[in-house]
Amino acid sequence: MDCKFEVELMEKIDSGDNRVTLYFSVPEGFTWEPSAHISLALEGYDENGEFHKDCVRKFSINTLMEENKIGITTRTDSSDSEYKKRIAKMQPGEKCTIIESGCRLPIRRENRGIVFISMGVGMSTVRPLINAIIKDSEKITSVTNICVNKTENYLYKDELGAADHIMCNSRFCHHRTDLRETIDSLNEVDKKIFYVVGSREFVQNMVVLLKEHGVAKEDIMIDKKPGILDGLYEGMSYDEIKKIVKAQKK
C-alpha cells in the first residue's frame, strides 16, 4: 500500500554485531499488523521532483501497535550501501518518510502448531508475531521459534528466553547443520505451519528442506511477493522465477 507518513527518530540502540535498532514516532493515522513491512525513505528521496530509489529501503516493523513506536533493526556493515551508512548515523530528532507499507505474514489460526525459522536480523520480523500470539493464542496449539545466528548474540535473546515458559519454545542454532537437526527433531512436521524469514538463499534452502520433510507448499509462509513461493517449492532459482513473473505481466 502506497502512503506518505513522516516519522521522527526517537531512540537508537546498538544491538551488537554491526546491528542497530531504531525506534520512530507513530504518525497519526498509521496502523500496521504484526510482521508488517515499510519502505523507509531518507531525506532527499524525492529531490528535484525525481524519485531516488537509493534513498529507500524496506524493513520489517519489530514492534506491535500497542508499544506506541515503530521499531526496525538492520545490519550496518554493508560497505557498498550508502543508505546503511546514512541510517546508521541518524540521531534522535531527525526525520524520514514511510512511503509504503504492507503485510505478507498474517497469523494463521487453524488449531495447529506454528514454527518460525529466521536467520540473523530476520528475527526482527518474527518478534511481533510471537508477542501477538503470546497475547492471544486462540486456535494456535504450539509455537516453536528457531533462530540461526553465527554468534551467541541473538536478537531479543533475553526476551525470548522469558517467553519460553509461557508457550514459545525457542531454539538457537549456530549453523545450518544445527538447523537441519532441529527440524528433524520436530514432532509432526508435516502438520505444522512454517514461517521462514531471512536472506534469499536462506529462504530458498529452507523451502527445499521443508518440502523434503513433507511440508505442503500451502503450509509455508515467506515474506516475498506472490509467485515466489510457487517457484521455490518447484526448485527454481530466483532468476528463473523472475523471468516467469515478468512474462506473466506482459
What are these regions (language model features)?
Residues 2-94, 149-151:
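Ferredoxin-reductase
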Residues 3, 73, 79-250:
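FNR/FR-type flavoprotein reductase catalytic core
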